[in-house]
């Protein structure tokens, strides 16, 4: 809840989304500090996914873990992408539940108050079978098979490199520049996504500090040339 993922290369799956918390109270903090500002139940949602590349690098079958104490089992998702947010509302869907022209009917709004918060999903690329959310705006969904998508971390004498063809697979796809104004405010603290010094974030530079230019592509690098450089 209150997460912003922007310009990442994600080869794994998002697990335990929407579960594992129950209606417990969880602390949130003062902006850029560690003091507790208040407590709030975890509703899930209020998440933002912009300009990421999702890759189904490994098989998508769920992981099954048997219980030690009984005959039950737990399942853990291994399907990459944002598909698990299909049933989460967009902001317009969520805000439409509230009528600000008259006093609130708390009994009528019980479901809205306990329901999931909205999500913002835009400009992501899905490769090798990674599945998009139906809420994704301007998504690239590739039909290239998992085995034909290459993402490997390679060690050489002078450091680590990324051996990948993802920038060939997303060639020609672009989205808008993301900044603090696009991300808005997290729901519960009502604070903007910003730099530690309180200034606005503008995602106009890539992993190496290279300017993204007017054609903004998803992922951590401004282009294929940058992706071929030594990482560290």
What are these regions (language model features)?
Residues 1-176:
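Glycine- and acidic/polar-rich repeat regions and solenoidal domains
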Residues 214-232:
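Short, surface-exposed, low-complexity cationic segments
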Residues 41, 149-220:
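C-terminal accessory segments
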């Amino acid at each position: 809840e209150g997460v912003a993922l922007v310009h990442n290369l994600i080869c794994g799956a998002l697990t335990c989304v929407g579960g594992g918390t129950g209606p417990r109270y969880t602390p949130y903090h003062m902006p850029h500090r560690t003091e507790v500002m208040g407590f709030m139940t975890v509703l899930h949602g209020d998440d933002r996914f912009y300009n990421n590349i999702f890759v189904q690098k490994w098989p998508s079958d769920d992981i099954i873990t048997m219980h030690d104490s009984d005959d039950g089992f737990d399942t853990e998702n291994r399907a990459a992408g944002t598909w698990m947010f299909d049933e989460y509302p967009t902001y317009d869907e969520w805000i439409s539940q509230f009528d600000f022209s008259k006093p609130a009917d708390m009994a009528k709004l019980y479901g809205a108050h306990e329901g999931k918060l909205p999500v913002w999903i835009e400009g992501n690329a899905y490769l090798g079978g990674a599945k998009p959310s139906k809420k994704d705006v301007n998504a690239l969904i590739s039909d290239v098979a998992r085995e034909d998508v290459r993402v490997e971390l390679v060690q050489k004498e002078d450091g680590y490199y990324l051996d990948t063809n993802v920038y060939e697979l997303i060639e020609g796809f672009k989205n808008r520049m993301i900044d603090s104004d696009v991300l808005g405010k997290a729901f519960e603290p009502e604070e903007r996504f910003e730099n530690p010094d309180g200034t606005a974030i503008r995602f106009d530079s890539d992993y190496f500090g290279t300017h993204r230019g007017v054609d903004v592509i998803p992922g951590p690098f401004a282009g294929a040339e940058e992706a071929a450089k030594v990482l560290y």
